[in-house]
C-alpha cells in the first residue's frame, strides 16, 4: 500500500518592513514627550495616528483626544495629528491662545508645500485621494480654490478642468501605489501637459509595505493585515494582497478579531501591519497562529528602513530651554525589537 505524501508544514510569512513608519513614530513620541514635559492633560486634535490601541494607550497616560480645536480649553496645549491640518486650524488655535505642537508627518508637510507652490503659479491641482480623509482635508485647505479631488481612475476619466495646459497633480501619501499610477495615466492621457510634483507623494513606508505584502501574497493562502479600519494605508494592504495573488486577506485590529474558520485549508499565512501599528499587536497575532500550529515564521524582506524624523521644533525649543537632550523616546526599530 502506497503511503500518502506528507502534509505541507504550516508556516507564517512575516512581511518586512511592517508597522510603525518614521512619521508615526515621531507623532507618538511627540505626544509622549509633551506629557513628560508639561504633564497631563495634553490635548490632541483628532487621533494622533489611525490606530485605536495607540490612542487608548496615550489616553491612559493623560492625553485627551478632541475632534476640533474649539473643544480645547483656552491657553492649553494641543498636539496636531500626523495627518496634517488646514491653515484654518492654526488660526483657530491662535485665537484660543493654544500652545500648538505640530506633529504633522514631514512627508505630508511636503505635499502641503507643493499645493501652495502650484496654486501660487496659477495651476489647477488635481489631488488624488479619498474624500474626507484627514490628510486630504488638510491638503485641500492649503489652496481650496485651486484643488479638485480625484478618487481613483474612474473619477479621473470624468474630472473637468478650466485649462488643460495648466494642470498639476498631487496625491494623498497613503494610497495604493498601483492605483495611483493608473489614475495618473488616465489624467495624463486626458491632459498631456499634466505637471508632476517634484517627487513622488506616496510615502516611502506606504510603498515599502505594499512591496513586502506583494511578495508574501504571491505564495500565501491567507494574508492577515493588522491595522484599524480607519487606517488608509492598512486598508490598502488588504487590497494589494488580494490583487497580488492571495486567496483571502483580512484586516484585524488585533488577534481577537481573527476568525478561526479563515484557516480552513490554509497552510501558509502571510502577516503584515499598517504604518500606525505597534509591533506588540503583530506579536499577539503570531502567538495566536502558533497556538494553532503555525509556529514556523519566515521573515520576507522587501526593504530595510532607517529613516528617523526629529521631534517638532516646538518641543526641541522647549527641551533646549530646559537644558535637556533633544532625544526621542525610542526609534521604531528599538520598539520593534523590544516588543519581539
Curated annotation (Swiss-Prot):
Pathway: Isoprenoid biosynthesis; dimethylallyl diphosphate biosynthesis; dimethylallyl diphosphate from (2E)-4-hydroxy-3-methylbutenyl diphosphate: step 1/1; Isoprenoid biosynthesis; isopentenyl diphosphate biosynthesis via DXP pathway; isopentenyl diphosphate from 1-deoxy-D-xylulose 5-phosphate: step 6/6
A GO MF term: 4 iron, 4 sulfur cluster binding
EC category name: oxidoreductase
Binding site for isopentenyl diphosphate: 50, 83, 133, 231-233, 276
Residues annotated for dimethylallyl diphosphate binding in this entry: 50, 83, 133, 231-233, 276
Residues where [4Fe-4S] cluster binds: 21, 105, 203
Transmembrane region(s): none
Cofactor note: Binds 1 [4Fe-4S] cluster per subunit.
Top-rank lineage group of the source organism: Bacteria
Keyword terms: 4Fe-4S, Iron, Iron-sulfur, Isoprene biosynthesis, Metal-binding, Oxidoreductase
Chain segments carrying region Disordered: 320-340
NCBIfam families (UniProt xref): ispH_lytB, PRK01045.1-3, PRK01045.1-4
Family that this chain belongs to: Belongs to the IspH family.
Protein name, per record: 4-hydroxy-3-methylbut-2-enyl diphosphate reductase
Organism from which the protein derives: Acidothermus cellulolyticus (strain ATCC 43068 / DSM 8971 / 11B)
Phylogenetic classification of the source organism: Bacteria, Bacillati, Actinomycetota, Actinomycetes, Acidothermales
Underlying gene: ispH
Amino acid at each position: 500500500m502506497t503511503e500518502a505524501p506528507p502534509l505541507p508544514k504550516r508556516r507564517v510569512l512575516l512581511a518586512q518592513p511592517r508597522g510603525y513608519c518614521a512619521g508615526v513614530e515621531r507623532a507618538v513620541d511627540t505626544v509622549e514627550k509633551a506629557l513628560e514635559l508639561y504633564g497631563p492633560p495634553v490635548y490632541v486634535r483628532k487621533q494622533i495616528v489611525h490606530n485605536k490601541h495607540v490612542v487608548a494607550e496615550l489616553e491612559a497616560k493623560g492625553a485627551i483626544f478632541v475632534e476640533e480645536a474649539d473643544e480645547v480649553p483656552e491657553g492649553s496645549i494641543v498636539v496636531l495629528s500626523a495627518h496634517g491640518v488646514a491653515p484654518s486650524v492654526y488660526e483657530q488655535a491662535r485665537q484660543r491662545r493654544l500652545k500648538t505642537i505640530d506633529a504633522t508627518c514631514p512627508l505630508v508637510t511636503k505635499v502641503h508645500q507643493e499645493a501652495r507652490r502650484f496654486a501660487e503659479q496659477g495651476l489647477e491641482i488635481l489631488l488624488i485621494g479619498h474624500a474626507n480623509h484627514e490628510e486630504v482635508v488638510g491638503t485641500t485647505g492649503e489652496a481650496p480654490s485651486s484643488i479638485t479631488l480625484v478618487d481613483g481612475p474612474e473619477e479621473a476619466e470624468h474630472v473637468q478642468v478650466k485649462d488643460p495646459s495648466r494642470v498639476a497633480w498631487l496625491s494623498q501619501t497613503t494610497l495604493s501605489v498601483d492605483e495611483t499610477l493608473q489614475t495618473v495615466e488616465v489624467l495624463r492621457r486626458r491632459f498631456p501637459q499634466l505637471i508632476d510634483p517634484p517627487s513622488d507623494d506616496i510615502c516611502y513606508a506606504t510603498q515599502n509595505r505594499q512591496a513586502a505584502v506583494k511578495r508574501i501574497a504571491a505564495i500565501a493562502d491567507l494574508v492577515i493585515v493588522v491595522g484599524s479600519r480607519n487606517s488608509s494605508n492598512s486598508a490598502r494592504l488588504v487590497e494589494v494582497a488580494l490583487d497580488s495573488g492571495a486567496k483571502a486577506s483580512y484586516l484585524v485590529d488585533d488577534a481577537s478579531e481573527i476568525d478561526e474558520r479563515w484557516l480552513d485549508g490554509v497552510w501558509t499565512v502571510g502577516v503584515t501591519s499598517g504604518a500606525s501599528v505597534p509591533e506588540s499587536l503583530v506579536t499577539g497575532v503570531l502567538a495566536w497562529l502558533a497556538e494553532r500550529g503555525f509556529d514556523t515564521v519566515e521573515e520576507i524582506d522587501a526593504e530595510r528602513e532607517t529613516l528617523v524624523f526629529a521631534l517638532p521644533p516646538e518641543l526641541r525649543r522647549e527641551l533646549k530651554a530646559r537644558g535637556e537632550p533633544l532625544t526621542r523616546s525610542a526609534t521604531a526599530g528599538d520598539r520593534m525589537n523590544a516588543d519581539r
